[in-house]
């Protein structure tokens, strides 16, 4: 059985023994789950191209932001992820490290809808680089962020007890394919 679910729910299914494996953005909240990282991606700040925020950050050319740059945005309306999403946790952590709590203009349940709202000028928000790579949105400038908190890792999680042969094979393949270091 394959279940498509957000990370927190996937972790819950794994802990309850309802699934053998869970693809989850780290961190796992349970210390009993073993995991293999699959890939890492950056988290970008998405900003409407023709906004005052874009000008405040130096124009419509993508560049790397420092924590001090994020601090300039503390009064701006953010489009945030709903609580319980790993991107919610990442967004909050990035803003806290810049010394503020973001002001929510809207809440979103998906990276794609958050990105679309930014493209329609409804606010600014954080998106994973995979969204930037697949989005066809000329109205958004994506800024990378120079922070260890601006990286997220997808991992396959599992409980070692009673792991099926198919699940063991998947974990073995994940270990072999893992090119993440450090």
Explain the meaning of each model-derived region.
Residues 14-24, 43, 100, 118-124, ...:
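Alpha-to-beta junction loops
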Residues 30-37, 41, 112-161:
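Beta-alpha-beta core module
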Residues 11, 15, 35, 70, ...:
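Short hydrophobic/charged patches on amphipathic alpha-helices used for structural packing
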Residues 55-62, 151-182:
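Extended ligand-binding regions for polar small-molecule ligands
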Residues 1-31, 107-108:
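Central regulatory/effector-binding core of bacterial HTH transcription factors
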Residues 61-70, 74-98, 164-169, 181:
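Secondary-structure junction motif
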Residues 30-78:
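Flexible hinge/capping segments at coil-to-helix
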Residues 1-2, 96-105:
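A local structural motif
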